[in-house]
């Protein structure tokens, strides 16, 4: 890279850095990026860079592949219905062990290695994520968010720490729930008055033509996002992600992004460049 290109990149990023300094950005970390060492390291550096220029990142994570590995080790067959993991008591124990004890700490360790300061917590800590049983209970201990109590996060963010949160919630009676990390991220973004919600996925973003990767919808508004759902342009796995973004925007988040986590440094490319890399939905 020659000097003029370096200067051009920095010049393009500067107004975004100035605009988002002091603002909170919630990032849902998941998908293939969690399985690829090179992508993981790039993600940790991206989060560290955001923090170093004054942005306040908050990371929400799932950990499906790691959960499946541990279920396999314990000779338990994973069960899914309508894309959601059926979670009985034994599976919930493993989900808690894996998300809180392994995946969360791996992310914290990775970010801390960059020189930034991450703090690992779960939705159980300080009743951060309160939940109830999802739907008719046919998925067992799968839950949905009823309330976010962000008081635990506020002093951490104010002191420059990066919260890393596992997507487990609980009822007022202390019953734990496994919750979709996308929806946790959306509800949390609204609760902490975040500037942005960013979902890292295994797709380029929202496609206008389902099987055409060149048909990426770069920037749409809330009304257009709803029309995409009505016209079945958005469906399958992209449907809950888009619904999550719509709900977050309706609750005051300024912008929501669905981006391809399989591209190295996609987070920085989306936030700090004019063209971005995925789909941005504006309120």
From Swiss-Prot:
It catalyses: N-acetyl-L-glutamate + ATP = N-acetyl-L-glutamyl 5-phosphate + ADP. Keywords: Amino-acid biosynthesis, Arginine biosynthesis, ATP-binding, Cytoplasm, Kinase, Nucleotide-binding, Transferase. This is Acetylglutamate kinase. Its EC number is 2.7.2.8. GO terms for molecular function: acetylglutamate kinase activity; ATP binding. GO terms for cellular component: cytoplasm. It is found in: Cytoplasm. It comes from Prochlorococcus marinus (strain MIT 9515). Belongs to the acetylglutamate kinase family. ArgB subfamily.
